[in-house]
């Protein structure tokens, strides 16, 4: 996308700071068409052009607009999220968060997995097609909708991809045992850093399990989970919380290893 077209796009979006993104302008329709066309060139790749994605995300941030609204408005299919990545550039530390939906018998199943690296960059993000019939999308909190499953990969495919990413890496998460459980995966205890179990953070909750939203607000000065949850945003916040106390959390993990 040329810089001149991008400037036109930015001008048209100046009115969207209230949270609404208009899509009626002809230039925007052309942009929408071009994005969809390029995305459909390889239906099975689930890769969104990084340059285009970064432009939209940057614009959303600069104008205080939710990323999801900008991406939806400009035709970046949210069901085609980043699923392929270079494992060599992931680094040693990754943070993961999952979103779930409700099925029969008041059970929950996996609907989205997001993984970021040490710097908070998204390295894996995909919706997951449930095997069971969904009885409650929980969109108000999960952000997941039925149309997200249109091209979503199977649970088995996502499980295998996540397992490969986790291999020999330190997994950061908040109550991460829930994420591993829904993925039907395990991970060595010495390679897990769970911010919900860190004593320093538990003190803020008077010994109870601290909520991620509260920790992000108090420790990071960041407002998350105000409406629909974003597993990407939650994973990024969790990684930031870990980095704040990395030395202490690593020491606890090493002590546990020496005792075993």
UniProtKB/Swiss-Prot annotation:
**GO CC, any one term:** nucleolus
> What is this protein's record name?
RNA exonuclease 4
**Any idea which GO molecular function terms this record carries?**
3'-5'-RNA exonuclease activity; exonuclease activity; nucleic acid binding
Cellular compartment(s): Nucleus
rRNA processing is among the record's keywords = yes
Quote the biased-composition stretches of kind Basic and acidic residues, using this chain's numbering: 12-31
Q: Does the keyword Nuclease apply?
A: yes
Q: Which Gene3D superfamilies match?
A: Ribonuclease H-like superfamily/Ribonuclease H (3.30.420.10)
Source species of the chain: Schizosaccharomyces pombe (strain 972 / ATCC 24843) (Fission yeast)
């Amino acid at each position: 996308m040329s810089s001149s077209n991008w400037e036109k796009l930015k001008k048209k979006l100046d009115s969207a700071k209230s949270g609404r993104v208009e899509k009626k302008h002809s230039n925007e329709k052309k942009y929408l068409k071009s994005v969809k066309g390029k995305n459909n060139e390889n239906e099975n790749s689930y890769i969104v052009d990084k340059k285009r994605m970064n432009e939209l995300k940057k614009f959303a941030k600069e104008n205080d607009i939710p990323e999801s609204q900008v991406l939806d408005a400009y035709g970046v299919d949210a069901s085609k999220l980043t699923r392929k990545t270079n494992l060599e550039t992931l680094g040693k530390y990754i943070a993961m968060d999952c979103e779930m939906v409700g099925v029969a018998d008041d059970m929950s199943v996996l609907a989205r997995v997001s993984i970021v690296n040490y710097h908070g960059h998204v390295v894996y993000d995909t919706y997951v097609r449930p095997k069971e019939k969904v009885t409650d999308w929980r969109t108000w909190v999960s952000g997941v909708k039925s149309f997200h499953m249109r091209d979503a990969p199977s649970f088995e495919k996502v499980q295998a991809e996540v397992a490969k990413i986790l291999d020999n890496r330190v997994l950061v998460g908040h109550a991460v045992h829930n994420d591993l459980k829904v993925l039907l995966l395990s991970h060595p205890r010495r390679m897990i850093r769970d911010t919900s179990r860190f004593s320093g953070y538990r003190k803020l909750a008077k010994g109870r399990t601290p909520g991620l939203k509260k920790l992000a607000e108090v420790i990071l000065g960041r407002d998350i989970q105000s409406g629909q949850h974003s597993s990407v945003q939650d994973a990024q916040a969790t990684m930031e919380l870990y980095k704040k106390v990395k030395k202490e959390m690593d020491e606890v993990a090493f002590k546990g290893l020496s005792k075993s």
